[in-house]
């Protein structure tokens, strides 16, 4: 896969790199971008093969929230069918890894995970990137990851895990830190097979009976903001784990979301001053993704195809960021020096982890000239 293929005429300063499930984990963990959830009961084979979902590079078949209990068995058979069909298409040259999205399965619980996994064959596994584990906590973490490691050993294939931290024990202040520390201790044992840490802000919000509106970001919800801050504090230190942002619930189905007149301001300026760019639903998403980046999140879960290109476009790195990051990483003497545009101080030691993250994002999503190009990237002029 490669990000931004929907806009082939866009002129990158540095092109994004190709990736697939076998790419080096150091790069791959930054490449998921907008990861779209799909109900496990629906057959998306032809949509995937025909590239009908604009910009789709990673997806999750859901056996949990998007699937009622009585349909789980049928959903399992459907997903096995999709994996089988895609693997056959790969074998026969109908598709290559360059055009096959990263595919994950969000399991319902430990028992359903094992039941589904027992039906997998090597034919399925070569197109399956990994599993998402909902309601992941210090009590079920070892069970999930021990069995996942067994699957890796059984098939001799890399099958990643992505824990979703959304449990009430993390939501509630009195139990949060001990719970997060317990989760991290277990994750650290299995770090080689952990691709990302994901967060469930909708579940966190439900613990307090709140829901952000279309004009607000998740960072405006004080209780949830504190939870996300603690998750980043424990799992984001020294870039130990890549943490993805939570789902944005709002979308507008429109036959045309094109740009007759592109804003002349940069995107941050437009959004923070509430200058309309697309529509309320997409502008709210863009504002939240900008705050994601400021707080260290990379990519996010999406629930509608219209979100994909916006999330992925904003993961691209500006030329100024890129040059600063490369200068910091390439410095042999350390110390302090002026930034690329002469407008900031770059201090090698404290800015190194930031520079590493920027550089990896540049490889996955490319380098653009400046902030104005974000709009050009997702507008498909």
What does each of the following model-derived ranges do?
Residues 1-381:
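Expand to "…catalyze enediolate/carbanion chemistry for C-C bond making/breaking, isomerization
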């Amino acid at each position: 896969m490669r990000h931004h293929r929907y806009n082939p005429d866009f002129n990158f300063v540095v092109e994004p790199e190709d990736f697939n499930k076998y790419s080096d984990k150091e790069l791959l963990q930054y490449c998921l971008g907008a990861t779209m959830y799909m109900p496990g009961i629906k057959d998306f084979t032809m949509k995937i093969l025909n590239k009908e979902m604009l910009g789709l590079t990673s997806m999750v078949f859901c056996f949990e929230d998007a699937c009622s209990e009585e349909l789980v068995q049928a959903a399992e058979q459907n997903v096995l069918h999709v994996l089988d069909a895609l693997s056959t298409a790969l074998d026969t040259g109908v598709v290559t890894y360059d055009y096959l999205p990263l595919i994950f399965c969000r399991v319902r619980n430990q028992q359903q995970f094992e039941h589904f996994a027992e039906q997998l064959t090597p034919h399925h596994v070569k197109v399956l990137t990994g599993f998402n584990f909902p309601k992941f906590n210090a009590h079920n973490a070892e069970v999930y990851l021990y069995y996942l490691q067994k699957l890796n050993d059984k098939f001799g294939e890399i099958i990643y895990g992505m824990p979703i931290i959304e449990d009430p024990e993390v939501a509630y202040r009195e139990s949060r830190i001990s719970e997060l520390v317990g989760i991290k201790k277990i994750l650290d044992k299995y770090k080689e097979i952990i691709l990302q840490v994901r967060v469930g802000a909708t579940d966190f919000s439900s613990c307090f009976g709140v829901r952000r509106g279309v004009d607000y970001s998740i960072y405006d919800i004080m209780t949830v903001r504190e939870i996300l801050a603690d998750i980043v504090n424990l799992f984001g230190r020294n870039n130990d784990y890549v943490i993805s942002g939570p789902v944005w619930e709002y979308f507008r189905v429109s036959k045309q979301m094109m740009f007759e007149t592109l804003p002349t301001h940069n995107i941050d300026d437009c959004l923070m001053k509430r200058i309309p760019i697309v529509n309320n639903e997409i502008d709210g998403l863009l504002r939240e993704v900008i705050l994601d980046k400021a707080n260290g999140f990379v990519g996010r879960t999406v629930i509608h195809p219209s979100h994909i290109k916006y999330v992925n476009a904003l993961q691209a790195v500006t030329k100024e960021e890129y040059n600063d990051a490369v200068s910091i990483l390439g410095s042999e003497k350390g110390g302090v020096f002026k930034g690329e545009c002469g407008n900031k101080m770059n201090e090698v030691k404290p800015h190194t982890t930031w520079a590493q993250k920027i550089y990896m994002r540049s490889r996955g999503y490319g380098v653009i000239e400046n902030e104005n190009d974000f709009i050009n990237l997702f507008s498909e002029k």
